[in-house]
């Protein structure tokens, strides 16, 4: 969840910050250089998530030309997301082939034998993250329009895409600040029930404005495909809805209306329940006004399930 820091940047923990931002080790740079056709001359840390170190690397080729790529190293293993490099590489191939704007996959080291840890090398997309658009309606319309394109990606027979499973939490008790503890308790029960019988589509699983790049008012790319899986479209819609509470409840609802129009279907509130329960560990801190908006959204969703 982007939460109160829409920039979606690095963790405030100093040890984690060093792990994610420090210059990649020689082994990783040697692998990247071999893929790019020359030694790496620079590596600049990019903003990214919490499980991987992301750097823009520049290599000098024998003919004097420069080659640039994004090196992503999965330096923080997550038992809930095994084989991260292979999983993201598979997602990039599928979504890219379907016309979704994604980074070009240049190379993958699925087990870390060459780069030291599992790693991807990707083309660099133009554009930047934009959480505060000058034209909110157009921004929301284009954001919502991305999801049917992602969800329309064909899943080839025999393709091994993990099935959606809710994120596990350390503690499922209601947050200490909860006004409606019973709502939270019921939400946990719903999240543990079998998912509704809805069509399974390709999910980004971490779709929100912090993972969408823009250039001159147009979407230039969707990044961070680590959590890709197959499941109900409502999972992606809900994840984005909760993150959009940063901009207000009315913005989240407007996004949903635009998605329904683009997808030609009706949103299922089950998605909100699963998404918010999946944020429980993150929601135990001081979230100010946003925590009230999250709880109100959850109460409406529980009532609608």
Residue spans for each PLM region:
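Juxta-kinase regulatory segment immediately upstream of eukaryotic protein kinase catalytic domains
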Residues: 2-40
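Helix-rich C-terminal or lid/interface subdomains of diverse kinases
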Residues: 8, 230-232, 238-305
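Short, flexible/disordered intra-domain loops and linkers
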Residues: 16-17, 78-83, 288-293
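An alpha-helical support segment within catalytic cores of ATP-dependent transferases
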Residues: 23-37, 148-205, 300-305
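Short, conserved clusters of charged catalytic residues that mark active-site
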Residues: 27, 38, 87-90, 142, ...
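ATP-binding pocket architecture of kinase catalytic cores
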Residues: 44-160, 197
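Active-site acidic catalytic loop and adjacent metal/ATP-binding pocket
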Residues: 47, 52-59, 65, 70-71, ...
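Hydrophobic packing residues in well-ordered alpha-helices of helical domains and bundles
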Residues: 85, 140-143, 184, 273, ...
């Amino acid at each position: 969840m982007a939460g109160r820091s829409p920039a979606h940047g690095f963790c405030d923990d100093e040890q984690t910050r060093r792990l994610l931002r420090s210059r990649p080790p020689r082994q990783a740079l040697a692998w990247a250089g071999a893929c790019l056709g020359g030694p790496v001359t620079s590596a600049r840390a990019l903003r990214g998530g919490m499980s991987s170190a992301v750097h823009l690397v520049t290599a000098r080729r024998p003919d004097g030309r420069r080659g640039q790529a994004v090196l992503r190293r999965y330096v923080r293993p997550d038992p809930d997301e095994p084989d991260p490099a292979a999983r993201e590489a598979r997602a990039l191939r599928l979504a890219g082939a379907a016309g979704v704007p994604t980074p070009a996959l240049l190379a993958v080291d699925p087990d870390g034998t060459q780069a030291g840890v599992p790693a991807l090398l990707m083309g660099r997309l133009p554009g930047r993250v934009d959480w505060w658009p000058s034209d909110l309606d157009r921004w929301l319309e284009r954001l919502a329009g991305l999801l049917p394109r992602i969800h329309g990606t064909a899943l080839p027979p025999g393709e091994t895409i993990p099935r959606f499973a809710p994120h596990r939490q350390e503690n499922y008790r209601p947050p200490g600040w909860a006004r409606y503890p019973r709502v939270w308790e019921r939400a946990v029960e719903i999240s543990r029930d079998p998912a509704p019988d809805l069509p399974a589509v390709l999910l980004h699983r971490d779709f929100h404005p912090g993972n969408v790049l823009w250039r001159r008012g147009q979407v230039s790319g969707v990044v961070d495909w680590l959590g890709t899986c197959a499941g109900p479209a409502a999972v992606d819609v809900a994840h984005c809805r909760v993150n959009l509470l940063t901009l207000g409840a009315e913005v989240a609802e407007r996004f949903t209306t635009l998605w329904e129009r683009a997808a030609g279907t009706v949103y299922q509130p089950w998605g909100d329940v699963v998404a918010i329960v999946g944020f429980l560990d993150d929601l135990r801190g001081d979230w100010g006004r946003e925590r009230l908006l999250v709880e109100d959204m959850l109460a409406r969703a529980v009532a609608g399930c």
